């Protein structure tokens, strides 16, 4: 039987599980907490950044046997890291398996995906209309020779569409993906959160919606297209679903620089927010 390894990544760390071992990699913020929570288990704590502690990539390469398989849920590992793991697997004449969420299969009481309401951020706060932002991104696409732009950064989607949400408790974003061409802007989200007010706003700005789960099938249809995306942000499954005939432009999302170049309204509101935060009890 071929040895298998599974890589699991979360905001606070990365777990690697083999047939005989399990390890958790985390940084200095969580050394104490992780040590306490792993006490009495068979999981080894790897303190990232400390001397003689291998990185996740080094550990995977060292422990993967010839012809072995590296597996992970392709939706939770970014495209660049996924490509690196692919290289490691190929070195050992093995393969990558990213089609299934094995944790989800055994996590029976997993909370459902958040479906919090979406609200529109008025131009009085953003200082720039959604139509203007979309036009600017389309110009950047032309400059790069891209026909399609795939956007997976929740921060950038919220900024571009002037919308906010509560799907993540500490960040006002909406769980979604976005596909932009010169003719279309398609927002993939849970359609239950789209009320009449939001639907009217989206139609006015030339934005159509599709179900969140439909994004991966949409990506498969982009044959012979030149696609702009940031592999450090989009996940491995997105990259793997692109047709072989598609040409990928791996570059920063145009919205990243556009967000940094704040207009007077955004500067003023940011200042007010910092003042309120400073005086908060």
Predicted regions and their residues:
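Short beta-strand scaffold segments in enzyme catalytic cores
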Residues: 13-17, 177-180
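Short active-site-adjacent helix-start/loop capping segments
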Residues: 24-25, 32-35, 80, 159-160
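Flexible, acidic/His-enriched mid-domain "rim/lid" segments that flank
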Residues: 52-175, 180-189, 210-281
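Short, solvent-exposed loop/edge-beta patches enriched in aromatic
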Residues: 16-24
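Alpha-helical membrane segments and adjacent membrane-interface helices in multi-pass membrane proteins
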Residues: 24-26, 187-188
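Compact, glycine/acidic-enriched structural inserts
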Residues: 28-63, 191-194, 198-208
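Low-complexity basic/metal-binding stretches
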Residues: 10-11, 261
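Short, small-residue-biased leader/transition segments that mark boundaries at the very start
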Residues: 3-8
């Amino acid at each position: 039987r071929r040895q298998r390894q599974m890589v699991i990544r979360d905001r606070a760390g990365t777990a690697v599980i083999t047939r005989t071992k399990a390890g958790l990699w985390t940084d200095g913020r969580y050394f104490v907490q992780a040590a306490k929570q792993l006490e009495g288990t068979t999981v080894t704590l790897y303190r990232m950044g400390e001397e003689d502690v291998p990185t996740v990539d080094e550990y995977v390469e060292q422990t993967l046997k010839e012809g072995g398989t590296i597996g992970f849920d392709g939706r939770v590992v970014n495209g660049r890291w996924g490509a690196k793991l692919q290289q490691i697997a190929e070195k050992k004449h093995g393969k990558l398996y990213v089609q299934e969420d094995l944790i989800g299969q055994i996590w029976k009481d997993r909370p459902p995906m958040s479906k919090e309401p979406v609200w529109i951020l008025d131009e009085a706060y953003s200082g720039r209309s959604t139509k203007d932002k979309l036009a600017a991104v389309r110009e950047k696409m032309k400059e790069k020779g891209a026909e399609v732009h795939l956007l997976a950064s929740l921060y950038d989607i919220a900024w571009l569409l002037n919308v906010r949400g509560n799907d993540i408790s500490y960040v006002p974003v909406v769980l979604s993906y976005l596909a932009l061409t010169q003719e279309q802007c398609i927002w993939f989200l849970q359609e239950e959160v789209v009320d009449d007010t939001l639907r009217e706003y989206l139609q006015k700005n030339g934005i159509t919606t599709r179900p969140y789960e439909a994004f991966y099938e949409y990506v498969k249809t982009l044959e012979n297209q030149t696609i702009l995306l940031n592999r450090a942000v989009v996940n491995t499954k997105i990259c793997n679903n692109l047709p072989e005939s598609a040409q990928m432009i791996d570059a920063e999302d145009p919205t990243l620089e556009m967000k940094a170049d704040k207009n007077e309204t955004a500067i003023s509101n940011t200042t007010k927010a910092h003042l309120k935060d400073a005086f908060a009890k």
